[in-house]
Amino acid sequence: MMMPHLSEDLVEEILSRVPAISLKRLRYTCKQWNALFNDQRFSKKHRDKAPKTYLGLTLKDFRIYSMSSNLHGLLHNNNIDLLMEFKGKLSSLNDLNDFEISQIYPCDGLILCSTKRNTRLVVWNPCTGQTRWIKRRNRRMCDTFAFGYDNSKSSCLNNYKILRVCEKIKGQQFEYEIFEFSSNSWRVLDVNPNCIIEGRSVSVKGNSYWFATITKTHYFIRRFDFSSETFQKLPLPFHIFDYNDSRALSAFREEQLSVLHQSFDTEKMDIWVTNKIDETTDWSWSKFFTVRLINRLDYPISMMMKSPLSFFIDEKKNIILCYDKHRENTYKSLVLIVGKDKVYREFYFPESYELGRTYLCNYVPSLVQIKQSGLISTRKRKRKDFSS
């Protein structure tokens, strides 16, 4: 049956309401639909109108995977695979095997990837296939990053920034640099957060968050505001009384932050979620989930280890945790899936050849454009009808 002739505006309006993952499958239906993926105006319209899809990504042995959506089956059927390889490819690479990803930082549908030993940086949109390589000015093995955007502009589209954090003297002296997409350049940032920040950053609504400490019993959240380029101190919904308490941050949906906590002397694990995130430091939290585990979560890390413990909450409120567990005289990556009915199951990955490189995070696909060194052109399209 032939499709009726539809106006360009009507087709665009329909497609702007299709989730990004589904729209990706329709991309090559016709040239006009494919062109929308490179249209900055359409990507903004799509971001405002399309339903969101919340995916769990895991970084395992320098490759990105997506978590299986059949978590109910995983909880009750031992024959279902835990992982399926993430389908997107870095289209600008000739040989993906040469690109070993050691860190990932999702933000606004984009993923900042750092290669093994921090030799290269690339920003990637898995839905559109767009990439942008970021030239490094300084590089150290201990570098970690934060990825966000400037909220002060009327449109944050393409106004992205990367913060480089380098621990020059262990636990005492840090160096900060910031890269702006608009200027295509790095500059030294003269800031001092007056604390030690832990682990990987988490991006929510354009800003980045870490656990931070001044003493080993005084913990809080440190936020980096990419608009003002300053650090801010935010409270936790609980007290950490022991450095060995298990803890992790994660994005919840697109606009909330979640935090996991398990005290050193108990099997009870709590997850809290912010009621909202705004520019103030006056936050409120709600307890989202409590479960009592048979065993404690291991937390065998140094302060700046890049992947100690991570977790993700899916759309059905199942919780997936990942951490490196000491087992049989070595460390193996363990995944713990907890259902909303508090039934849980453990999986061990095949043995990882590098400790601390398994990491889980929340990812929301989008069609957002990556600004290249030059401006992205927004072409004026002629009025025409779409038909099959």
From Swiss-Prot:
Coiled-coil segments on the chain, per record: none
Domain called F-box: residue spans: 1-46
Transmembrane domains' residue ranges: none
Family matches, as SUPFAM superfamilies: F-box domain (SSF81383), Galactose oxidase, central domain (SSF50965)
Cited InterPro entries: F-box-assoc_dom_typ1, F-box-assoc_interact_dom, F-box-like_dom_sf, F-box_dom, Gal_Oxase/kelch_b-propeller, SCF_F-box_component
Any single Pfam family the record assigns to this protein: F-box
Origin: domain of life: Eukaryota
PANTHER family linked: BNACNNG10540D PROTEIN (PTHR31672), F-BOX PROTEIN CPR30-LIKE (PTHR31672:SF13)
Identification of the protein by name: Putative F-box protein At3g17490
Species: Arabidopsis thaliana
